[in-house]
Amino acid sequence: MEQQKTETRSITAEQRKRVEEVCFRSLALIGRNCEYLEQHFDRTGADESTRQAVADIDTAAIQLDRTLTEAITLLEFLHEDTKPQLYPIDLCELLQQVAAQSDMIRAQLGVDIRLDYGGCTACCVMADRRDAELLCLHLLSNALHASREGGSVCIALRRTESDWQLTVTDDGCGLPGEDVQAALENRRSFLGGAQLGLLLCRECCRRMDWSLQLEPAPEKGTKAVVNIPLYTGESRSDGTVELRTDSETEREQRKYHLRAMLVREMRTMPERGDPEDEF
């Protein structure tokens, strides 16, 4: 009887997929109608409050889409019985793809992105490509959410005796602590989020046997520190590592997908302005 009760209350993968399709289809419909209304207003005119109402609906739909995507991915990870198959990848190349969007970020958010390899030209690590991309994207997204216009985010990579250390440091609102002003600014920066991004980052690290810590930046802001085991697999005679090869089409698809994910993240960012105006 207990087994039958459990089976009745469970949801199958097919049922979950149908729920996802309905949700995303509805969100896409909201987005298309918001776009139509904006074009209609441009032709016929509309007062500022009406335009703002439509913009708010569009922003809420984007945030819901982001939260739903994160929740679904997190549930998939938590329900998987085994960890993903890891392959050697060049982390430097992945970070270059992320940093390649720095011009777009500067133009839209007024935040500078700096990439610092510390003299490294390649960084071979064992990883799942999808998990590594999600991790880098969400660490950058968190840093951008915390940053103000005119701020900067530094993505740095260093090798130690025991591991690679990837850090993402911002000069933004910092971690919420006992200081009331800092806590309020942190809340404003991440207002409207379900705070699934950090959970997703930790889960990506767990699946790849990496580790993640958050700590205060030296002067102001937050530093995310990812410790990655050194590659211990087979190497060629010249010391290089044979990476998993992808076709040119696959590489271009990855770059486009990464950019598309970052564009969506940026559309959920709070409006920039003078922090004194918020309090």
Positions of the model-derived regions?
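Conserved micro-motifs of the catalytic ATP-binding
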Residues: 79-84, 124-127
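Short helix-loop "hinge" at the ATP-lid/N-box region of the Bergerat-fold HATPase_c
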Residues: 142-144
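Conserved catalytic submotifs in the C-terminal HATPase_c
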Residues: 87, 112-123
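Short beta-strand/loop element within the Bergerat-fold HATPase_c
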Residues: 150-162
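Acidic ATP/Mg2+-coordinating residue in the GHKL
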Residues: 170
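Short alpha-helical segment of the dimerization/phosphotransfer core of two-component systems
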Residues: 59-64
